[in-house]
Curated annotation (Swiss-Prot):
Its main location: mitochondrion. Belongs to the mitochondrial carrier (TC 2.A.29) family. InterPro entries: Mit_carrier, Mito_Metabolite_Transporter, Mitochondrial_sb/sol_carrier, Mt_carrier_dom_sf. The modification N-acetylserine is found at residue 2. Interacts with VDAC1. This is Kidney mitochondrial carrier protein 1. The gene is Slc25a30.
Amino acid sequence: MSALNWKPFVYGGLASITAECGTFPIDLTKTRLQIQGQTNDAKFREIRYRGMLHALMRIGREEGLRALYSGIAPAMLRQASYGTIKIGTYQSLKRLAVERPEDETLLINVVCGILSGVISSAIANPTDVLKIRMQAQNSAVQGGMIGNFISIYQQEGTRGLWKGVSLTAQRAAIVVGVELPVYDITKKHLILSGLMGDTVSTHFLSSFTCGLVGALASNPVDVVRTRMMNQRDLRDGRCSGYKGTLDCLLQTWKNEGFFALYKGFWPNWLRLGPWNIIFFLTYEQLKKLDL
């Protein structure tokens, strides 16, 4: 077995941070849309936003443009850990399974994607909780990243930092298990068919496709995960709303209808689409560097 290749880890982290910075305001609107309208949480019961564009304009007008980047620090920290581990582990697992990229199959890539998604998301979960809590605040973020981190730990303990970890792992298994294999297989078939070469156009089309498929597959889990992470669970055992993952899913469906599970779909897709395009274009260019 060849030595571990460090390049996918570094390139994956750099490309992930670049993509996160370019699409973060869309991600923030997705979070705001997903947490509103909860009948069992008075703080988020009001329907403040009619859609993604309305959310962007209202947040910018009422809270200032800086509010559109509330939570960017933990988001970048998350990508530095999650993105680095995800891509590096995925590429490493593929090389363990088969030596040559040409021998890869959809099944191998899906299994490698699921495993890398679960591992990386579990490790990076505290930064995800922190990002969502900061995004959910309807005013200027108080205390910054460190202050919010300390606040979560003091009020909820270590468990608070890993709140929703099972959902995060499930979502990552779906997203990574779908997006990376779809990108690889789409790119492979476009090149082998002779329709396109290994060019920016191929990378663009492949990344657009995987972003759409990933958004469709992951949105219901993402809604439940966002609500669970945003929920306060105090040290004395009191909980502000949902009893667990299944309860959150059922209450959301029962109280708000099935399509509530697709709240935030448009910003989710409009984020995942550009996010994947920026990520893969950056990643493919970094791969060409002679290091």
